[in-house]
Amino acid sequence: MRRSAVLGLALAAAYGAWGLAQPAGAPTRVTLSQGTSMAAALSPDGRTIALDLLGALWLVPAEGGPARRLLEDGYDAHAPAWSPDGSRLAFQAYARDTWHLWTIRADGSDLREITAGPFDDREPHWSPDGTRLAFSSDRSGHYDVWTVTLATGELTRVTTHPANDSMPAWSPDGRDIAFVSDREARGIYARRVDTGAERLLAGDKAVLYTPSWTPDGTTVAYVAVDGPATRLMVGGTNIAGPQEDVFPFRASWASPTELLYTADGVVKRRARAGGEARTVPFTAEVAFTRTPYTLRAREFSPEGPQPVRGLMHPAISPDGAAIVFAALGDLWLVATTDERPEPRRLTDDAFVETNPVWAPDGRTVAFSSDRDGGVALWTLDVASGAVRRVVGDGTTAAFSPDGRRLAYLDGESVLRVVEVASRESRQVHTRIFEPGRPSWAPDGKAVVMSALKPYSTRFREGTNQVLWVAVDPTPTPDGRAAFAPDRWMDPIPHKSVGMRENLGPVWSPDGRSMAAIVDGFLTVYPVARDGTPAGPPTRLSPELASSPSWTADGRRLAYQAAGGLRVVDVVDGRVRQIAPRLTWTAAPPPPAVTVHAGRLFDGRAGSAVQRDVDVVIEGRRIVRVAPHRDDQHRGEVVDASAGTVVPGLIESHTHLSKAYGEAQGRLWLAFGVTTVRNPATNAFEGQEEREAIESGRRIGPRVVTTGEPLDGSRIYYPGGVALDGGGLVDQQLARAEALGFDFIKTYVRLPDRLQQRIIEGAHRAGLPVTSHEIYPAVAYGADGVEHVRGTSRRGYSPKMSELRRSYGDVEQLLIASGMTITPTITIQGGFQVLTARDPWWVEDPRVARLFPPAVAEAGRALRASPLAGAELAAREALVAPQERLVGALVRGGGRVIAGTDSPINPYGVALLSELEHYVRGGLSPADAIRTATAVPAEAFGLGRDLGTIEAGKLADLVVVDGDPLARITDLRRTRLTVRGGVVHPVDRLLAPR
């Protein structure tokens, strides 16, 4: 059996059957004539063009015409390269968890996988004799050029520089390989194959891509991207048009005097001497059938007591008798001797307490809280309830074995140690990218953390591995003292150990083991005294787990599952279930209230502004919207006769942070935001946020939430679930149902076929799925796409070019499918552009009083050194196409929902800025407001309750001074927000708690 056939069977088993049958019904057919970020390669005989479009390979006649597809969905194929005899194509594909090289015959037969394994192999190019492929790979810890001999599979490393070398191209005579390098003298180099001698072919301050040798081998063509401009270079001459959007892929030489390349969404031919380019037209048809399903209903104010799901960061006491955890904003304690214990509340206030950890004596708990305004570390005497502030700006912490010190991470992820008694704090390590909670070595001389270990600096993804860090300096031979160097420890090569956050590793008190969450399960492995792995891992939990913690004797571990708390005996493996009897009840309905609006926009499509109307609210819902009459008023009357009333705003992409404390909820309402959607979070933190707000323990918006994003074997952000091989899909979906997720988020390294399985499983449960992908996500039935650009495993965006332009494929697929898109223009340079034009928010009292001081400080720094002149014009040139895309999508019937990826830019402020971008892109203010009200409400299955101001809907609305239907910037002028019938004047929201 051929290797490709064996691979097909293996993939079908791991990822589910390919080509699953679709229900009867007419498919949607889309004919494309443009592609975004597509590559093209001309065959050696000059008769056929190979395109990579939508993650598949297509063949087009050299003079243009219909495209013939070579590959089905699921391979994510890119970078096609013809063999010298024109019989085969090499390409890179992401069929499983890593990029590998493949070849296929030009007739679509004999598909072969050439490389395999845990490393990424990209950008193939044939040797002139057709026996080898040059490619780039991260096998050495950075990207180098390698070759593979096709007959034997033998791999040879070509470049060895510690910088990243990539995008190789063999010279016509086979003596040299050209490549791009990011070494100190950045540029395109050539390396002599037989001697290893290297020379610089082209240096440039711009970012360079994909060399292609001239037919005579004297120089190379390449692409340069320089801010808002791209160049197609031959030697030192730019032959591209002045506004041309040249895609960063290898050009083909049609003759010694003409190149074929991709730009402006099409294939072009251009003479080496310059002049006008000639477009090669093509059409490519895709067809898909999206299966309807019923979204699971969300009850915002359920009747009666509800079980608390948001138990955060449980930790077992040293003697194993109790577990402390956070829920509903407070700390709680339960005994481990009862399967249904009654919790004891340890704190009871309006603030947010979280991240509890026991001192070794079992009498004290350290935790983080915003009880004095900013998030700080505190200690609590469990017996007396006395609390004591230890240090400011502390998040996750761990007690030293002697209990005298706390190792902790500050708000910038800098590792520090504080003496508990004296409260003296010192830095022990520079900033680490969002590591997990530290865990002390038993000798108290070091800590370990789960931290991201990227495979290279070219791309950001990697695995979570164990980072050992010394916390005290040691004497050196010269009599001074220095910190021992960091050490990486990889207990399970190429597999994440812990998911950062509070998921291990946790060093056992006896120093003999570490516990961590691996593949979603509680796992322990033996270690030497210095933490070096000393044996194979053992899985202890029968279910997905989080938050491991040891008893002092090292005999038991507590962990958290979707169904509650667990304690496992490390020796005999027995697991005891502990389900605390903790419930929450929806806040009672508020008294009746009437809002008298001078102007009202109800949020419905095509709806005109109504004048002088009353919105009558009883309990949580609107009972009447009618022309103003004093005799129909009920309860308190809110006089908005001089202002405008619009539906409460929905922020469709934000990441909530416990570091903002309880003020986070107030700041959202202060900007008119009554619902937020959090597309990636710790699952239990997301549930806690929802339950604390719905129960009335905290003021805040409604929370639409998911859990940790589902990803491939490599991850980037903490909490990312590495679905190695797809074996945990069913368990993760079951967990999502059990915890009441509102939707599922998949991330960029998840293979397409796994995404298909997740979409189908989530839809069976009534849960929508969103990701960064458009195709084949569209064909698989995905519900949404995040970011008009965003991170991509390909190293470039298939949704937007380097000049931030999107073409017909993006527009047509989004409009035809009805899939939502959350553009997040503000994080693609938009926020800086608008702030340069008008830094209105910098001194806004909402920012001054509700945000951490660093936010306002950053704003003042922007205002002090604003973008201006040519730099501002360059940024605006990159932002304007994104704005125009939004306008085109909405005019074409597409579904745009406003979101920002805050707090990259400030909460609330960023959403208002995002809507201003949409108006700049051609939307009316009314249509822009709908992207943050009615459209997302319908998309999330919440249209019955949210999104418009109509009788029967929940009373979520905003009163603003001015007229945002005439001037979208007036939406900044929030006077009060009504959320579920509760009136929140802005001045009251700004008052300290």
Question: Which residue stretches match the model-derived regions?
Answer:
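A flexible loop/linker signature enriched in serine peptidases of the S9 family
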Residues: 50-58, 73-77, 90-102, 106, ...
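Active-site neighborhoods of metal-dependent hydrolases
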Residues: 732-750, 791, 796-921, 993
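Divalent metal-dependent hydrolysis catalytic cores, especially in the metallo-beta-lactamase
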Residues: 664-684, 702-708, 738-749, 759, ...
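Acidic, glycine-enriched loop/beta-strand segments at the rims
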Residues: 601-614, 627, 880, 906-909, ...
